[in-house]
Amino acid sequence: MWVGEEWWRPLPPGVSGDVRRLLAARALRAFVDGMISILLPIHLHRQGFSPLEIGGLLTATLVGSALCTLGVGWFSHLGSRRRWLAGACVAMAATGVGFALAADYRVLLVVAFLGTMNPSSGDVSLFLPLEHTALAQAAAPQRRTAVFARYSLAGTLAGAVGTLAAPWPGWAGLPIGAVFLFYGACAVGAWALYRPLSAAVETPEVGVRAALGPSRRIVYGLSALFALDSLGSGFFVQSLLALWLYDSFDISLSVTASILFWAGVCSAGSYLVAVPLAGRIGLINTMVFTHLPSSLMVMALPFAPNLGVAVGLLLGRAALSNMDVPTRNSYVMAVVTAPERPAAASMTATAKSLATAVGPLIAGWLMTASAFAWPLLIGGGLKATYDLLLLWRFQRVKPPEEQ
């Protein structure tokens, strides 16, 4: 079976140029997101903003992204996927310029809400449903999980390199504002990759609303569970995790970036392992039995007696927690019909983004009120609950290749 024999290849055999371009664009965006996820909270912290204010700003970015994602899913039938990707690139460029020029907190809130800034180590932007549906359309069913694994691998590995590059402005004697301008410039590079995409990434029924139909109950159920998982993740998005490490163990920006880089490398490697594992035990079992131990490791983090133990738990979590990402994305695209894919991708992504947005604000308040890492304990507990509910509710709902 291919997934068990050739999972190690950089790309599945026979993938199209469209898939390669989408993976490259994801890597480019993830690289600059990785830099921003480290620099944004520390920059705001040095500017005198409290953890609660920083959490509010991160919440604004996630709520804005969620609403944009919902709009993309609702109105995507009005234009081609390439045209929507072009609009997303314009929004990304404007976001970078806005953060580079703004200094007032209220202005930053507006830019965060309307823009594409990503405080998470994963992708929560309006690019996500567009790229997911394009990948599902361009990939053969038997290659779908492997393609999504490479998509996640490209994003996580590039994001890890981005976190490692976060101290670069300080080394070069540049203000952090230069990184925000670089973020905006990367939007031009992303559009250069999206522009040559072929008609194969488009849904044939452009101009027809892709509403949910026979798969409505499945998508609603998955959206609710994904929201619970993302609510837990919101308590320790990478920006807040970086701030917790930076403050709790009194380490430098370079050390913080290095820790999160190696965590990203561990996550990236796990995506490839997820492919043969899913081929053996199924998508849902892979999602649950790798994610649950990682949730327990998060709950153990507040009790880490020193930096070494904390780093060990973080790396162990990273090696397990994201195996559910390519399998989850593949599962959603598999259990709905092709015309429903844009709406399904948008609804699940919106549920995740809105739920994630709640966490940073509460976590910021908790970090202000107490020195104990309550956000990690609560967030890990919510994610463990999600794992058990997902197994109970969807273990019998099989994708076509498992039936």
Question: Residue locations for each model-derived region?
Answer:
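Helix-loop boundary and gating motifs at the non-cytosolic
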Residues: 12-63, 218-226, 230-260
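Hydrophobic core of transmembrane alpha-helices in multi-pass small-molecule transporters
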Residues: 27, 95, 105-126, 309-323
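Transmembrane alpha-helix termini and helix-breaking/packing motifs in multi-pass membrane transporters
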Residues: 41-46, 159-179, 243, 247-248, ...
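Conserved MFS/SLC helix-loop-helix module at the cytosolic interface between two early adjacent transmembrane helices
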Residues: 67-103
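Helix-to-loop junctions at the C-terminal end of transmembrane segments
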Residues: 68-80, 170, 270-283, 367-368
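Structural signature of the two symmetry-related core transmembrane helices
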Residues: 83-98, 285-300, 380
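Glycine-rich segments within core transmembrane alpha-helices of 12-TM secondary carriers
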Residues: 146-167, 351-359
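C-terminal membrane-cytosol helix-exit motif in multi-pass small-molecule transporters
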Residues: 162, 166, 184-204, 386-394
